[in-house]
Amino acid sequence: MSLSTGSTGSERSNQSLIKGALDLDPWLEPFSGQLIHRQLNLRKWYDEFKQNEGSLTNFASAYEKYGLHANWDTKEVFINEYIPNVVEVSLVGDFNNWDTNTHKLKPVNDFGLWSLTIKPTENNEFAVPHDSRYKISMVTASGERIYRLCPWLKRATPSTENNLYEGRFWNPQPTETYKFKHERPRLESKDGIKIYEAHVGISTPEPKVGSYKNFTTKVLPVIHKLGYNTIQLMAVMEHAYYASFGYQVTNFFAISSRFGTPEDLKELIDEAHRLGIRVLLDVVHSHSSKNVEDGLNMFNGTDHYLFHGGTKGSHELWDSRLFNYSNYETLRFLLSNLRFYIDVFKFDGFRFDGVTSMLYKHHGLSFGFSGDYNEYFNSEWVDNDAITYLMLGHKLLDEISVRENNYKFVSIAEDVSGMPTLCLPIGQGGIGFDYRLSMAIPDMWIKIIKHLSDEEWDMGSLVHTLTNRRHGERCISYCESHDQALVGDKTIAFWLMDKEMYTNMSTLTPFTPVIDRGIALHKMIRLITFSLGGEGYLNFEGNEFGHPEWLDFPRKGNGESYAYARRQFNLIEDDLLRYKFLFAFDGAMQHLDTKYGILLSSQAYVSLKNENDKVIVFERNGLLFIFNFHPTNSYADYKIGVETPGVYQIVLNSDSLSFGGHGRIEETNKETGEKLQFFTNNERWNDRSNALFCYIPSRTAIVLQVKEKVV
């Protein structure tokens, strides 16, 4: 679609909607019409919600009305449900012996809204007891009676009789409801986002399902000690199939009951806030489980309840259902879902899963993105309804932010396509995300480690991949996430050290060549990704200390074993194992940003990519980063170009003994106690105004800071 950009007042006004995007990227000019269309489509829906519901925020508060609720003042229980294309609706459960005749809902309008209010018992108690089972029974237009779980239910638990999940009415006494004690933490202005990606169920060394309470008491202190300021919680939304890693959601407003109660999760988030850590939800709005009896699929007997009908509503690779983002009630459901997790559980933002699948009608399947802008704006390929939903979601976050004293909620997109303007504010003509995941970086590392000898590592290609991101759109860099930890793949530590991790990680035995190389490169890979790859950083739990095993959830194929569905945090507590060194280095790396503000600073200036020496040098926010990837060559008095003249000192050294290195750099004079200093001279070198000489051992990274500037 192409809209005119002539001289009328309306057209000039429309053009102003995308001025920020065009200023950043003039190559978007030919696609102005499509960008304006996105903005106008957002405005259309926004105005419609304002007219019909009072505001977007009100529209997204449907979780307070829809579903089964308790009125503590009157002791009444009420339910509202959107169920089109049925002739009868009943509430059934333990409370009425599953009788379909005693508690029938009444139609409220012609659009499919049904409602029922249940009076209290003779003892003035709720007619539906807390934590009792219930379902919605319907008679379809064809006369079939079906039973389904409420789409808005707040708790579901596995049946003791079969593998299906059962809906439960979560309505604890006020004295048993967790009360939040701590404010949402706000990051310091220079503190970049440092994300610890975690899954509650695997966050225990024991071969079992971990709990919210275990995570609160055992894992949160570890994350805090490391210096991460954000947690990304996976698999929170209820999913009947544990091995889906939480990505086949069955109940969108219920949190996973495997790990504990809703009150337990509230306590976890509140304790994280006390520690100054924000918590993001890994939200799955790209698709839904195809489960029928305990999911959303075929809820009212049709295949198009909240979803597209027919083949358009199915994801062939994921074997799941796809939402219809042009449907009014689908938007109500999904936007309310976002607000629900912010209001009820105090999540501080979202990582949106599967954004590439949402953005395109082809869902990115068998499509190789080349960077041609036509791939991002072709109306036959792009799902503009999904884009409008994502923009509405960010508009909602902005409105909630105003209500919460301008708290900045964070949004991250999992997108591999490189969609332009994805991470620009709506006010600049963008879709609204704060960050996108730099998904090319982990792929690069695996290819390098798997296919190239150390001598074949290409410094220029490495730097290009780490720095290749859209101007003005922030990225989260990472070496590996949960994807690389899954069975069938290997973590970086396992690619580097393989089976020797089981036999040669003891500090009581000498380094083997494999372990020596693995520990050194593990640190270097993480540091260069952290410092050069983006404006934020992510780590999957356990990888910070080189967790020795892959991740495999219990399933038929492994005999329902939990042996690999765990994280062995006990390894870092064993003083005789080398995992403690990797853990210590990762913590030092996080605190480096906390102290010096690396991530939020301008992109680094890379002054050297020496292929023969395998040396990379760059400056970022006043720090000088030096990497020697050569497997054997150490360099004495290596000349380094630097812009700022002065006296430099080491602030991080991967070869330090405290990080499992060899201590080849004497950072402190043993006799005087003075720190090693590097003095610049005014010789121009590698396009920098000054130079200094530095000893850089093989497979070592050092970070210098100017301690005393010279004019």
UniProtKB/Swiss-Prot annotation:
Keyword Transmembrane found: no
Residue sites binding (1,4-alpha-D-glucosyl)n per the record: 98, 135
Active-site residues annotated for this sequence: 353 (nucleophile), 414 (proton donor)
GO biological process: glycogen biosynthetic process
Reaction catalyzed: Transfers a segment of a (1->4)-alpha-D-glucan chain to a primary hydroxy group in a similar glucan chain
Location within or outside the cell: Cytoplasm
Site feature Transition state stabilizer, where: 483
Stated role: Glycogen-branching enzyme participates in the glycogen biosynthetic process along with glycogenin and glycogen synthase. Generates alpha-1,6-glucosidic branches from alpha-1,4-linked glucose chains, to increase solubility of the glycogen polymer.
UniProt-recorded name of the protein: 1,4-alpha-glucan-branching enzyme
Native source organism of the sequence: Debaryomyces hansenii (strain ATCC 36239 / CBS 767 / BCRC 21394 / JCM 1990 / NBRC 0083 / IGC 2968) (Yeast)
Gene name of the encoded protein: GLC3
